[in-house]
Design a protein with these regions (language model features):
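Structural signal for hydrophobic packing residues in well-ordered secondary-structure cores
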Residues: 13, 53, 57-61, 108-112, ...
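Carbohydrate-associated surface elements
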Residues: 97
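Flexible glycine-/small-residue-enriched beta->alpha junction loops
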Residues: 104-110, 154
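N-terminal glycine/serine-rich phosphate-binding loop of ATP-dependent small-molecule kinases
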Residues: 1-90, 102, 106, 118, ...
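Gly/Ser/Thr-rich active-site cleft segment
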Residues: 2, 115-174
Length: 174
C-alpha cells in the first residue's frame, strides 16, 4: 500500500504466517506539492522493504537462503520512471494523484465509452498512461530520459532481480 511496506514470512506447507513486519513505523510520506497531487519516492519503498525483511528474518530466525519464493503485492496505478541505469528519474506519481485526469478524460473520449468500459472496466483518468502523458507535456526533460516505466511492484521486482518486467495484471492497469 501507500502507507507502509509490509513483509511476511509464510510457511508454504501450512499457510501460516511465521513473522510479519512493516516500515516505516509511522505512515509513509506522501509528497503533495499541489492539491490533488500525490507522489512517493520509490527508493523509500526499497529501503523500507529491506528493513521489514531484516526484522522478519531476525524475528523468525530463518536463514534467508532457505526462502524459496517471494511474492509481491502493491499499490496500483503508480508510475515509476527509470533511466537506462535503472535509476529513478522522479518521485512516483501514485494511485491517488489526480493531476492527469484531463489526459485520461481525453483518452476516454478518443477511445470511446464502449472500449473503455468493456476493456478497461473504468475511465482511464487515473491510470498510469495518463500520468505518463502528463510527464511528457509538463516535464519533457524527464520524459526524454525515460528508459522504462513500471508500476510500484515492478520497481521492487527490478530491485530484487535486476530485471524490468511486469505481470499480466500489471498490464491491465493501463
Amino acid at each position: 500500500g501507500s502507507s507502509s511496506v509490509k513483509a511476511s514470512l509464510v510457511n508454504a506447507e501450512s499457510g501460516k504466517c511465521v513473522s510479519s513486519a512493516f516500515f516505516p513505523k509511522t505512515e509513509a510520506e506522501i509528497i503533495a506539492v499541489k492539491p490533488g497531487w500525490a507522489e512517493q519516492n520509490p527508493e523509500n519503498w526499497w529501503e523500507n522493504l529491506k528493513l521489514a525483511t531484516q526484522a522478519v528474518l531476525a524475528d523468525s530466525r530463518v536463514d534467508a537462503a532457505d526462502i524459496k519464493a517471494i511474492g509481491i503485492s502493491y499499490q496500483m496505478h503508480g508510475l515509476v520512471c527509470v533511466d537506462k541505469d535503472q535509476h529513478v528519474l522522479r518521485p512516483a506519481i501514485i494511485w491517488c494523484d489526480s493531476r492527469a485526469v484531463p489526459y485520461g478524460q481525453k483518452a476516454f473520449e478518443t477511445l470511446g465509452e464502449e472500449v473503455c468500459l468493456s476493456h478497461l472496466l473504468n475511465s482511464p483518468g487515473n491510470f498510469t498512461a495518463s500520468k505518463l502523458a502528463w510527464i511528457k507535456e509538463n516535464e519533457p526533460s524527464v520524459y526524454e530520459k525515460i528508459y522504462k516505466i513500471m508500476l510500484p511492484g515492478d520497481y521492487i521486482a527490478m530491485k530484487l532481480s535486476g530485471s524490468i518486467c511486469t505481470t499480466v495484471s500489471g498490464l491491465s492497469e493501463g
